[in-house]
């Protein structure tokens, strides 16, 4: 069993929150957000490449994304990848540029997205609690090896619980902000 390392546990917990923020940024809110296209992979030159490696994505207007494809021969594969991504976007081709108007979200779709944001947050909370459990196990192992006293273990457990609560609060705040943005409240 690994020795108790609070800095490593904190880094892993914060990693779960950053992962959550990344997942949340990919949820469509009715406003143009370049992160919406981050997960798209395009089949070009006989391999699969992230969209960011074949084009520049920008948001020139609040409800419009612009995808500037660097190589004209890749416009069709990029358009196909965007259409098949399941984001409900219909690219309009204009030379090397694809314009993506962001349609309004239906109330039903907003609720689905809010539920998805909650699910992402719950997954992050579970990951954070698993890291806490690893820390608690390491503390108990250190105590059983007589590397720390019972009082030191209890102090460290209290510390770890406070850290866990703080990090979970950050995850909940990120999810609540995204849900508010999605539901337009």
Swiss-Prot record:
GO terms for cellular component: cytosol. Pfam families: RRF (PF01765). One of its GO terms (molecular function) is ribosomal large subunit binding. GO terms for biological process: cytoplasmic translational termination. PANTHER family: MITOCHONDRIAL RIBOSOME RECYCLING FACTOR PSEUDO 1, RIBOSOME RECYCLING FACTOR. Gene3D superfamilies: 3.30.1360.40, Ribosome-recycling factor. This is Ribosome-recycling factor. Belongs to the RRF family. The gene is frr. It comes from Novosphingobium aromaticivorans (strain ATCC 700278 / DSM 12444 / CCUG 56034 / CIP 105152 / NBRC 16084 / F199). Responsible for the release of ribosomes from messenger RNA at the termination of protein biosynthesis. May increase the efficiency of translation by recycling ribosomes from one round of translation to another. Keywords: Cytoplasm, Protein biosynthesis. It is found in: Cytoplasm. It comes from the Bacteria. CDD domains: RRF.
């Amino acid at each position: 069993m690994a020795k108790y390392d609070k800095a490593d546990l904190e880094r892993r917990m914060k990693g779960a929150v950053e992962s959550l923020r990344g997942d949340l940024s990919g949820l469509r809110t009715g406003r143009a957000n370049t992160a919406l296209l981050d997960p798209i992979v395009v089949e070009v030159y006989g391999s699969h490449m992230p969209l960011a490696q074949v084009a520049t994505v920008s948001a020139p207007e609040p409800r419009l994304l612009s995808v500037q494809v660097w190589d004209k021969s890749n416009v069709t594969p990029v358009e196909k990848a965007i259409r098949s991504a399941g984001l409900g976007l219909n690219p309009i081709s204009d030379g090397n540029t694809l314009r993506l108007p962001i349609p309004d979200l239906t109330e039903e779709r907003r609720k689905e997205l809010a539920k998805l944001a909650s699910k992402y947050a719950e997954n992050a909370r579970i990951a954070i609690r698993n890291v806490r459990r690893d820390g608690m196990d390491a503390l108990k192992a250190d105590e059983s090896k007589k590397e720390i006293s019972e009082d030191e273990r209890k102090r460290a457990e209290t510390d770890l619980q406070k850290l866990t609560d703080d990090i979970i609060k950050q995850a909940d705040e990120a999810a609540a902000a995204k849900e508010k943005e999605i539901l337009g409240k």
